[in-house]
């Protein structure tokens, strides 16, 4: 049986299918040096990396069997859904979940799912050690592959989050598979903030954009200002100002969040983002580098309006990311985040040992030590070699440093930080005595 150190290596490494390494290479692989490159790191002006590669998860293999269609359960209905026990991740609807499964119990379970509705439950553990979960998300398999490695049957899966649920009951079958009785949570769709005071005779005067309008040039900006003024003109009939209604308007909230997202990806196009407020709010939730406590809070929210308001509040206030173990050692900030994937700056990836890491890409990180030599094996970003990165203070695993294998690639280096190792914090300001007194919109 592998010791605790072996299990940690398996969790942090992307390659090394075999758990044991040759004895003569152990000293080289454990070599520890301070990461100096981050001090001079600058945001890349040009990115020639194919941003579609990370989302395709090519490291799982190209010949996966794909499925079409989707399984959706009725709102408020009660369902009994099997649980994958090794998945320790808070899955967001619409988020992709790659998996590599080795345990015979899980392999058998997935085979049975393929013959049925391909849906399993991912529990949002509020306490992983005690396996406590009140909420979760259904996941549907859309790509599947079986193979054998040294006589061990391996199942590789790509799944996507579908619907939120509340856990009603958990029970374990005789074969060891856990079944969850859940209630599917509905999405509360709120009417327009102006619907209560909008005169039906003036409905024909409203203007609606046929498609998302570019805000890049001044002309588009003027159009947007005019559109907003016309949209909230009925506020003049009430005792409340127009800006108050805009605080709860889905379109306005989405536009404010898009401005933040463009700071992470200057080439971001509106066409690449969901136009539906519900899907958009989940897309943002999946790429926010927040801890499990905040993510579960977002998962509980049943209204896209409230979810968008909370996400905007988090993006504005939680600007520093620290080591979760040290809690005060800053690793990076919101300004250093950039996107190297079509799905945004953060996505879930799985290593050959089956450990799933939600990895945030940043162009600058500090207070890190590098462990071992660079390796291209099983790299989540093809063309880049990875090196394990640890906190310089407490030596806890933070993520990886990625370096380009070719000189013409841009960026030449970046860091991938695992969400589970980061703690979002609110920096002290002169106007605030303590960050604890700052209340997020949850």
Curated annotation (Swiss-Prot):
Region feature (Disordered): 1-45
Gene3D superfamilies xref list: 1.20.58.1480, LON domain-like, Peptide methionine sulfoxide reductase
Alphabetized UniProt keyword annotations: Cytoplasm, Disease variant, Intellectual disability, Membrane, Metal-binding, Nucleus, Phosphoprotein, Ubl conjugation, Ubl conjugation pathway, Zinc
Modifications the protein undergoes after translation, according to the UniProt entry: Ubiquitinated, ubiquitination is mediated by its own DCX protein ligase complex.
Compartment(s) of residence: Cytoplasm; Nucleus; Membrane
Tissues expressing the protein: Widely expressed. Highly expressed in brain.
Gene Ontology cellular-component annotations: Cul4A-RING E3 ubiquitin ligase complex; cytoplasm; cytosol; membrane; nucleus; perinuclear region of cytoplasm
Annotated ranges, domain Lon N-terminal: 81-319
Residues where Zn(2+) binds: 323, 326, 391, 394
Modified residues (Phosphoserine): 25
Domain CULT span(s) in chain numbering: 318-426
GO biological process terms, semicolon-separated: locomotory exploration behavior; negative regulation of monoatomic ion transmembrane transport; negative regulation of protein-containing complex assembly; positive regulation of protein-containing complex assembly; positive regulation of Wnt signaling pathway; proteasome-mediated ubiquitin-dependent protein catabolic process; protein ubiquitination
Main location: cytoplasm
Membrane topology: Peripheral membrane protein
Subunit details: Interacts with KCNT1. Component of a DCX (DDB1-CUL4-X-box) protein ligase complex, at least composed of CRBN, CUL4A, DDB1 and RBX1. Interacts directly with DDB1. Interacts (in pomalidomide-bound form) with IKZF1 and IKZF3. Interacts with ILF2. Interacts with TRAF6 and ECSIT.
Protein name: Protein cereblon
Highest classification ranks of the organism: Eukaryota, Metazoa, Chordata, Craniata, Vertebrata
Underlying gene: CRBN
């Amino acid at each position: 049986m592998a010791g605790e150190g072996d299990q940690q290596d398996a969790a942090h490494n992307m390659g090394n299918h075999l758990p044991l390494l040759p004895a003569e290479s152990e000293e080289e692989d454990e070599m520890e040096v301070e990461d100096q490159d981050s001090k001079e790191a600058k945001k890349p002006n040009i990115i020639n990396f194919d941003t579609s590669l990370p989302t395709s998860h090519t490291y799982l293999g190209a010949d996966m069997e794909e499925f079409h269609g989707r399984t959706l359960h009725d709102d408020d209905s009660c369902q009994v859904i099997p649980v994958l026990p090794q998945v320790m991740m808070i899955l967001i609807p619409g988020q992709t979940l790659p998996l590599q499964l080795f345990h015979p119990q899980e392999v058998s379970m997935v085979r049975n799912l393929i013959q049925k509705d391909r849906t399993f439950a991912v529990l949002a553990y509020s306490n992983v050690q005690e396996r406590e979960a009140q909420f979760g998300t259904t996941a549907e398999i859309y790509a599947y592959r079986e193979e054998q490695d040294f006589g061990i049957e391996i199942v590789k899966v790509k799944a996507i989050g579908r619907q939120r649920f509340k856990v009603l009951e958990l029970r374990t079958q005789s074969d060891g598979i856990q079944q969850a009785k859940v209630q599917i949570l509905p999405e509360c769709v709120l009417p327009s903030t102006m619907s209560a005071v909008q005169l039906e005779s003036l409905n024909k005067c409203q203007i609606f954009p046929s498609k998302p309008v570019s805000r890049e040039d001044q002309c588009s900006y003027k159009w947007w200002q005019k559109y907003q003024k016309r949209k909230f003109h009925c506020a003049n009939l009430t005792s409340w100002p127009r800006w108050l209604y805009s605080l709860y308007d889905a379109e306005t909230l989405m536009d404010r969040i898009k401005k933040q997202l463009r700071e992470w990806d200057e080439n971001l196009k509106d066409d690449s983002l969901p136009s539906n407020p519900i899907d958009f709010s989940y897309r943002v939730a999946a790429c926010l580098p927040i801890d499990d406590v905040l993510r579960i809070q977002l998962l509980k929210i049943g209204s896209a309006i409230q979810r968008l308001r909370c996400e905007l509040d988090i993006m504005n206030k939680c600007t520093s990311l620290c080591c979760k173990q040290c809690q005060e050692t800053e690793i990076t900030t919101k300004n250093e985040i950039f996107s190297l994937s079509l799905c945004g700056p953060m996505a879930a990836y799985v290593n050959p040992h089956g450990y799933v890491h939600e990895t945030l890409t940043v162009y600058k990180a500090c207070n890190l030590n590098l462990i071992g030599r660079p390796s291209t094996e099983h790299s989540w970003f093809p063309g880049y070699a990875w090196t394990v990165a640890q906190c310089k203070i407490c030596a806890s695993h933070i993520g990886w440093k990625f370096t380009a294998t070719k000189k013409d690639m841009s960026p030449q280096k970046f860091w991938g930080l695992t969400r589970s190792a980061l703690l979002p914090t609110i920096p002290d300001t002169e106007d605030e005595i303590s960050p604890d007194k700052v209340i997020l919109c949850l």
